[in-house]
Amino acid sequence: MALYLVIRLRGQPDRRPEEEKALELLRLHKVYHAVLVKDDPSIKGMLERTLSSAVTWGEINKETLVELLKRRGRITGNKRLTEEYLKKIGFNSFEELAEALISGKVSLEDLPGVKPVFRLRPPSGGFRGTIRRNINARGELGYRGADINNLVLRML
């Protein structure tokens, strides 16, 4: 079972109501916010049909997920996600948590106090294409597969 990372790249103006609702359901309220979602047919359909003009997504690997959790993971009170806190909720390390997330044993919503949204920065070096077009048309939007890992590492 794959775990997708979804990043919002485009802002609020001129969004259709169904796009706004889908972004709200995914908790992508601001540009450069990211969430982890399961590989589910309903989520996949929502991404492909409704949100392909506002977000980019792909399968995240374990190494990138560990870095994302270490550097951008937050708990209640806007404090960093630390190894001490992970031990309190039953995980010995970031690697163990990442493995549990990817295998589908646990989700971020199930963990007490862990915020499910990651606030990223704009990518260092900028985007390779425009954020107005799809990835297939020399843009940045839409499904990018494993290339999402390179983008996320530049946004941490």
From Swiss-Prot:
The keyword Protein biosynthesis does not apply. The keyword Ribosomal protein applies. Keywords: Ribonucleoprotein, Ribosomal protein. It holds the Pfam family Ribosomal_L30. Belongs to the universal ribosomal protein uL30 family. Part of the 50S ribosomal subunit. This is Large ribosomal subunit protein uL30. It comes from Thermofilum pendens (strain DSM 2475 / Hrk 5). The gene is rpl30.
